[in-house]
Amino acid sequence: DLHSTSRRQRQMCIRDSSECPPTFSVSPDMVQGIIAGGDDAIRNAVEGAEDNFDLGYSDADVLSENDVAVVISASGNPKYLMGVLQKAEDVNCKTIGITCNSKGRIAEEAGLVICAEVGPEVIAGSSRLKAGTAQKMILNMLTTGAMIKTGKTYENFMIDLKATNEKLKDRAIRIVAQIAEVSHSDALATLLKCDWEVKTAIISLKMKLGIEQSRQELRKHGGVLRKLLHAGQAV
């Protein structure tokens, strides 16, 4: 999955893609964010980048037929994004356009168009306001929905999180305790045994299995917790 954006939507594109690895334990390559002007454009304006069709085309070289390219623009017209869409078409890659202008070129060129018509901005032309907020919500829905479909959650729990700091370790303990219906101390003890693998700890506690056997059972079910816990049931 590739998020590509013009200058004004740069922060949301990078932020959303960078949150996927710690939240869902996916590879950084699974959801990538690219912006007109590259990494320099995260903090500084790179003038002319969003008007460069060839730059968008070359930046999208990472795309293949197995990907989905999501292009984001309030106006729906940056040439940079037209380059991304052209590259996607050339490699038979599916495309989604997120825009706030139903008459823009993105609405014409993208395979699936999500258009949030938010009306005039409080400050005319400042698309970081209503347009940016609406597009950020849409982007969150897309990535979160995709992660749910691929088994990265159980009910409303982020059971694939990476417990890399104290806040996330505390969250992991609470998730394991609640799903496995055990005390926080039992949840912590099991998490310590399995290197903070939340799904492994849940399986070990709920199914009374050892750590390695729990990992094996998860692998048999493609790493999807709900398939294992509800084996034989409709999920």
Segments predicted by a language model, with ranges:
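Single conserved hydrophobic/aromatic residue that forms the stacking wall/gate
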Residues: 1-10, 14
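Short, flexible active-site loop motifs that bind/organize anionic cofactors or intermediates
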Residues: 3, 46, 71, 177, ...
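Glycine-rich phosphate-binding loops that contact phosphosugars or nucleotide phosphates
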Residues: 11-137, 146-150
